[in-house]
């Protein structure tokens, strides 16, 4: 019996890992992988990690990875080739060697596309200058490492402030490079809501990173050698020895499109529950493959931080033994990074996304301890923001910014969301708790109980972003209910101070016809003040969600 031929197109590591699993499932499979360079490709998070770890010999590491795939699974890796055509009727892939220019073809029984993402090269003057990189390969990493070691890279500009941009900025900062992060949108980290992203921005600025938002790069200026030396925005001229451009990544789908493969609404390759395209025998995996969002049911394109094990299992089993395995659930777009001594994690929908989907959204923000609080060591605050459908309590999303607890909290909520859970399920979830994280309620239970109180109408909250807007446009009373000594140490502009214990005696100092926003350190005393003032007949009340500790605006 002839061996089944599997061909993988693309250097994204998901492809060769799926091939290895398929060979493990069916040893009769003969697998070949066609890649454009000398090595497989990692995503930009891992490439950024290599930048900050100067002692890591990335080429030796990747060489050993590729040798393991060859030795353990018999996979043939054909390097330095460019695929020029997919011929579904003939079941052939045509390619040419990039070094010798010769043209060849390979036949397949199953074809797997793992082409990953490619940058959209902007129409910006100077984009082709030296030392302007899109951080797409190990060669980029090595060039950056060598430039830093030689003292040639002292100032860098990172363009694009998503999670990959923030992580890349940290990698350069850890190497002693002066970093400027430039984002054309109104905030860094569009994966997070504004007030959560601002917490990260404040930390980055505190660490010495310059952060510019709402600024589009207009041009890059080079020297006589053709290397970049300046980045021009509408407001700044930024000196730069290196520019890393991370804006506007898109799935690499042109070869698939030419072969008659349907490209989905997200811009990625459309696949079914078997990860198979509309062309029988051709599958897609990784960042170039479209997924379905678990909450909205709509197609999405994911820039994954790691290999999706569930997808690899499905596609490898189907390649090995026919379409017998299906992908049961959609994705929640869960992401997390650790950067600048902060953990950042999110899952589900952001507030803006949820509203765009037509949900009536309720939010709750709490501050919880993180790290080693109870042991007398250092600790950090962890901001937790939960979003639910006001009509039924269905969980729509959660975001965390703080210490090492962030991804644990998000992972736990993501598990409940994948089961269709509600905030009531969170409130009664039996999870491992420890007094180093919470003296009373587990953080998940805490944010769930705050949310339930809101849904029951026990109090009304206001987000930091909403309060910042009100302070610019409306005359509301900002009532700080902390002690006088705490108030003197710092509060919000225009706030007045009536300590919680003095509310009854001093209630006549408050105008009942104006909106009163109650603030305290974490929001707990403000909540008690809300209850007491309601009992005194005040109606136009709200509590600052998360308290002053989580208010990120100046």
Model-derived segments and spans:
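A Rossmann-like FAD-binding core segment of flavoenzymes
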Residues: 30-32, 72-74, 78-99, 106, ...
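Rhodanese-like catalytic fold shared by cysteine-dependent sulfurtransferases
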Residues: 424-476, 484-554
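Glycine-rich dinucleotide-binding loop and its adjacent helix/turn
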Residues: 113-175, 264-265, 270-273, 496-500, ...
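FAD-site-proximal beta/loop scaffold in flavoenzymes
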Residues: 128-152, 238-317, 412, 416
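Rossmann-like dinucleotide-binding cores of NAD(P)H-dependent redox enzymes
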Residues: 155, 165-221, 300-308, 325-351
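Mid-to-C-terminal Rossmann-like scaffold of FAD/NAD(P)H-dependent oxidoreductases
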Residues: 2-5, 288-404, 435, 439, ...
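N-terminal Rossmann-like dinucleotide/flavin-binding domain of flavoprotein oxidoreductases
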Residues: 21-108, 193-210, 351-353, 446-450, ...
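Beta1-alpha1 glycine-rich phosphate/pyrophosphate-binding loop at the start
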Residues: 2-76, 169-192, 326, 334, ...
